[in-house]
């Protein structure tokens, strides 16, 4: 079976985001600022515009933070919705398809990590502390008693994410070595 074209996957991601946003009431629409949802939007932009490196940046944000955070939340709360499952799994499928098609580009880790770090800071200043989007106001509930204040928690999260992003980069590079070599050695 032939994989869907990038534009179709981009539109599917936009549709999933719209569906999930529609499921939020006014008090919880800020939850759409969680990095996983922003990463989905970044992936959609990359897929629709044909910017592979942008799509890859969104994908590594999902692999390194979004999916792990979502799975931990589902495990802790025993609660999710159909739109949440869709908006978390569809980007993974689209990312895998596109990375298999075009390989894994170089230079994705540090820009993605900086984006994550700046996004969390912006959420600290713009979101309701009660919702704690991206743990911008404190550590995740189940481990809050082990962490220091918000800034120590943020620094620890940022360091963990940097390691996770580098590990994902190594794995994705190895899994797509032949395509990545072809991508980087092809004439412009």
Give names to the regions the model predicted:
Residues 38-48, 89-101, 153-171:
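Hydrophobic cores of alpha-helical transmembrane segments in multi-pass inner/ER membrane proteins
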Residues 168-185:
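Membrane-interface capping segments at transmembrane-helix boundaries
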Residues 128-168:
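Membrane-interface transmembrane-helix boundary segments in multi-pass integral membrane proteins
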Residues 1-11:
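N-terminal membrane topogenic signal
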Residues 45-49, 53, 66-76, 97:
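Membrane-helix exit/interface motif
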Residues 13-22, 61-73, 114-125:
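Aromatic-anchored segments of alpha-helical transmembrane domains
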Residues 13-60:
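Long, hydrophobic N-terminal alpha-helical segment
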Residues 22-29, 72-82, 101-102:
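Membrane-interface helix caps and helix-loop-helix hairpins in membrane proteins
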């Amino acid at each position: 079976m032939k994989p869907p074209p990038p534009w179709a996957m981009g539109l599917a991601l936009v549709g999933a985001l719209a569906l999930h946003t529609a499921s939020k009431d006014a008090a919880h629409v800020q939850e759409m600022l969680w990095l996983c949802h922003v990463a989905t939007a970044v992936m959609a932009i990359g897929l629709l515009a044909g910017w592979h490196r942008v799509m890859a940046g969104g994908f590594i944000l999902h692999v390194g933070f979004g999916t792990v955070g979502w799975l931990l939340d589902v495990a802790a709360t025993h609660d999710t919705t159909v739109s949440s499952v869709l908006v978390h799994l569809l980007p993974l499928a689209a990312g895998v398809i596109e990375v298999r098609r075009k390989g894994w580009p170089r230079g994705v880790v540090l820009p993605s990590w900086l984006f994550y770090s700046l996004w969390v800071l912006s959420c600290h200043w713009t979101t309701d502390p009660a919702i704690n989007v991206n743990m911008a106001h404190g550590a995740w509930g189940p481990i809050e008693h082990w962490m220091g204040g918000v800034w120590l928690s943020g620094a620890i999260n940022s360091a963990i994410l940097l390691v996770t992003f580098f590990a994902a980069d190594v794995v994705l590079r190895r899994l797509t070595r032949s395509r990545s070599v072809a991508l980087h050695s092809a004439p412009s």
